[in-house]
Amino acid sequence: MEHIESKVKCYRRKYKRKGKEYTTTQYVINLRKEGVESQGFKCDEDVIITHKSTFESLIDMKKDHEANLKEKESLQKNLSELQVEFNKLKNEYKHVKALLDKKEREVNHLENEVRRLQNMGLFEIILNKLRKKKAIEGEVEEGVK
């Protein structure tokens, strides 16, 4: 922010009119030519005059605002990186879940097969194997004819 520092000077003048005494106060703010030109102020330009403490608090607010903007940009960048990582992990989770479901189905199938075989006697197992073998041979012979 462009600014020029100066002091407010007060001049009081007393005068009399028609037997009454009056006092007027004039306030003067002197600006050095070098300061005005170096800060880029121009003739007939509107300016604001405020207390130095108010101006310093405005400067502090501006610095805080800039720091908040930088922090916001940093947090947004961090958020986008975390979003990408989250999406990767989500896809990996879906893949692992699908593999787990497939393996569970295989395990259930094998457990059912084990239970079925445990319930069957040795004679029934051999008989089933022979039936399957004959069925396969029968299909092969039909395919050859």
Curated annotation (Swiss-Prot):
It comes from the Archaea. Keywords: Plasmid. This is Uncharacterized protein ORF7. It comes from Methanothermobacter thermautotrophicus.
